[in-house]
């Protein structure tokens, strides 16, 4: 008998409301044959006899439809709802949500970008249970939050969680554009983090970046512009009240010491402070209003392209971010501005290649190019000067000159603090590259068995230029012959700009090789993982640092019966050169159990408690962030 010829079918893809789905993926199961729906949700495809179609679209439940004898199909797909079938990212793998026995919190990209912030750590504040965040500054480039998972877990000064981006340890967490993120998971207890061994004591943040989906190219743009302002600013005394209270303090001192009371300010001085008729020699400076803008700006733009075929899928993203400071009058000349500023460019490409039916590859590259400008005195130094400056010490800037008053009580001048300490310009460049290969051995050895290998190369370069210049300050004096005339006497000379430079660079190479097993036998489901990894960190710019290496062996075994009884064992055996010889390696095991009570026959079916799981765990983890370099310790 001769094989039957392929036949042509047509159809329409709609949602539950009858609206056409544009760009839905229609694939003949078991082949590379497929197409996407057009603007009206229609498609035409030649298929083999007895073909089964798989229809998928982002945000909708994947649906399979047997063709049978139909020549025209009307296919309805439903929106996906979050369920226990949802897959969550765990250490070196993925698990169904219903099978997880560890403590894991998750947030999706859609939820993440609902809060527009300058970095991801600030987007997480108040969004995930067990996560504690401290924001110590609001200055551009310094406003990232410090994160703690379930509080302080170690005795060292570094209590930050381990950051894993697409399975690789990386530190440029807050430089990632949130539009590049697919999901973010936090591993909180030892049963979840023991697989990271000596690095898992402070918890782990797992970031998975976006990948392409099969279908036509999708171009997406997002942008936002924000005005930022201080949430709360202190109120200070005006000059008249300050002078009055200063006189009262002198009077109280004289009573205690028995000396003659001599007021510092006359009634006429206080009246001039109050009425503002002599604004230079009797100023009433509100340093908050004089020094700070009402608003600063933040701008963010992202454009990304995604799509793919059965063989190649891609995600390409580029973004721009800019955040300005809140100080006034900081542009010294056309080339120099001491106002804080954070500017960043992000680029990312993720490619997935299905080379054969069993062999696949992933190539990822990300770059962050950033520049941060900070005042030479530091933002904390400027705020300290504003807090300590009294309102009668200076009229501020007069004709763009820094002016002091002879009787300013020795107060600091915030303008001199800001302008005469110059500024620092930091350039920070990160490049991350990853190659991952995966081979499915199901057809060669046994079903559910696969091997994978990864290699990553990360490079970081930092350069600093510090610009310094001394600005003259002037003393205001009244002309003895013409009391209406006030002249400014220079008290220091202006210097030319000087520049000092510095730099730093480092690189890291990471490799891993793993064997995965995932198999279901009736009501029994088991998974296993054995993985070897190593990394080497090198920083040639630092005098006393020597290359730092890490090696580890990772294992995981899970068992599930009837989606009811769950057991999991994780272990990490790893070591680092941060410790002395003979004490570099440690074994970190963890075991966890789970019982899905709601799957038992005796559990009453109701709409109040639909799912109930009890779990418990025990594990040991370590911390290698003990500070300093090997020789210094």
Tell where the protein language model's regions lie, with residue ranges.
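Short, small/polar-rich motifs associated with maturation and membrane association
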Residues: 1-347, 361
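Residues on the lipid-exposed face of transmembrane beta-strands in outer-membrane beta-barrel proteins
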Residues: 209, 221, 303-309, 349-353, ...
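Short loop/turn motifs that connect adjacent beta-strands in outer-membrane beta-barrel proteins
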Residues: 212-217, 310-311, 326, 358, ...
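Transmembrane beta-barrel strands of outer-membrane/channel proteins
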Residues: 219-227, 318-320, 363-369, 453-459, ...
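A surface-exposed, glycine/aromatic-enriched loop/edge motif typical of exported proteins
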Residues: 229-267, 368-408, 461-484, 612-633
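Flexible loop and strand-edge segments within Gram-negative outer membrane beta-barrel domains
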Residues: 230-232, 279-319, 323-327, 338-413, ...
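Small-side-chain secondary-structure face that scaffolds active or pore-lining regions
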Residues: 321-344, 366, 372-376, 381, ...
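Structural signature of Gram-negative outer-membrane beta-barrels, strongest in the C-terminal barrel
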Residues: 354-356, 499-510, 518-633
